[in-house]
């Protein structure tokens, strides 16, 4: 879907300013933060609508609680032999199990569907080979009716996500 309405695309001066003031500094700071041996995995976190939007082929389809992505298939494995994944499949599978255990009975945790990971995960994985996972969080977990953020639900969600990530790290660190 287009970002700008027809006839409202910014001119080259505005585009250059946006790149200089936001895009380049963001990616430089991110690369700098990863320029250490102490970072063992990185997460690119987003929120997703509870249902697919009308512009998608699967419009109205309920979305999972979490979508964990490494550019692979629905098991976290490469789409085809030799294709890029940004996190080892066994790690992504362990992370999915940990999230599913933490949110048992509340909904699905899936890998690479409806999202497979995007520019940030690929670009920054390629720089240092630090594993990257894109995490999509269903807004229904923390939004009340009318799209207002429920602060109590959000605080609980933070704790549970931390618990899921800690459980994952404990499992793969054994």
Which role fits each region the language model picked out?
Residues 1-174:
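N-terminal catalytic or cofactor-binding beta/alpha core of small enzyme domains
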């Amino acid at each position: 879907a287009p970002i700008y309405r027809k006839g409202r695309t910014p001119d080259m001066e505005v585009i250059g300013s946006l790149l200089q003031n936001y895009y380049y500094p963001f990616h430089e700071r991110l690369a700098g933060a990863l320029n250490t041996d102490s970072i063992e995995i990185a997460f690119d976190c987003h929120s997703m609508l509870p249902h697919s939007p009308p512009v998608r082929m699967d419009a109205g389809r309920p979305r999972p609680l979490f979508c964990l992505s490494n550019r692979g298939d629905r098991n976290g494995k490469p789409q085809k032999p030799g294709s890029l994944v940004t996190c080892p499949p066994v790690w992504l599978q362990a992370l999915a199990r940990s999230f599913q255990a933490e949110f048992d009975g509340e909904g699905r945790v899936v890998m690479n569907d409806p999202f497979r990971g995007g520019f940030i995960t690929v670009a920054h994985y390629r720089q240092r080979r630090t594993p990257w996972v894109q995490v999509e969080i269903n807004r229904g977990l923390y939004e009340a009716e009318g799209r207002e953020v429920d602060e109590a639900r959000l605080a609980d969600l933070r704790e549970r996500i931390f618990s899921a990530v800690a459980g994952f790290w404990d499992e793969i660190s054994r």
